[in-house]
Amino acid sequence: MKIYYYHTRPIQEALDEWKNHLHPGHILYGLTHFSKHGIHPILHHYRHFASRIRFSLYNFFEIIRCKEPYDLLYGTSFYGLEFIIFLRAFGLYRKPIAIWHHQAVVRNSNKLKNLISRFYYRGIDQMFFFSQTLIEDSLKSGKVNAGQLHLIHWGADLDFYDYLRQHLPAANEEEPEKTYHYWERES
């Protein structure tokens, strides 16, 4: 399987840092494990924009112009994928979309916004959540169904931190560790 991997930051740099034990893998949302499962990612070319609309438009054109075939769009967030998701909801973007959703899907008090939002979520095929509570709260919105929501247990990259413990100099145990507070600056 080949996926288009979207992240809201420059990912190649972070992946290179991870390979050199300078960046924890859990921030890469599975990227470091995909190859073990036969998943081959195409990395999105990130570019920062202050405007969310310009950011979404840039991402839209980057994804649409991708020449390499892929089976699925995998996003670490929906932020910046809004145009693609709406196109999927309209049936104009054919690839399935799977994203991490970092908060519960909520119901809006404004009926028009709620209607638009319900349509928007039709453009997301699968969503990954960090807790069962977020899933349960999302189901209450009426915008998503249980079949598209998945609980993924996510935690620290223990291999990364074990490597740091083995390779960083040990603290001198005779001296007590000094705690610094932002209000106690040394001159």
Mark where each language-model region is:
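Short N-terminal targeting/anchoring amphipathic segment
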Residues: F60-G80, A98
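A short, charged, and often flexible helix/loop element on the N-terminal side
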Residues: P41-N59, Y74-T76
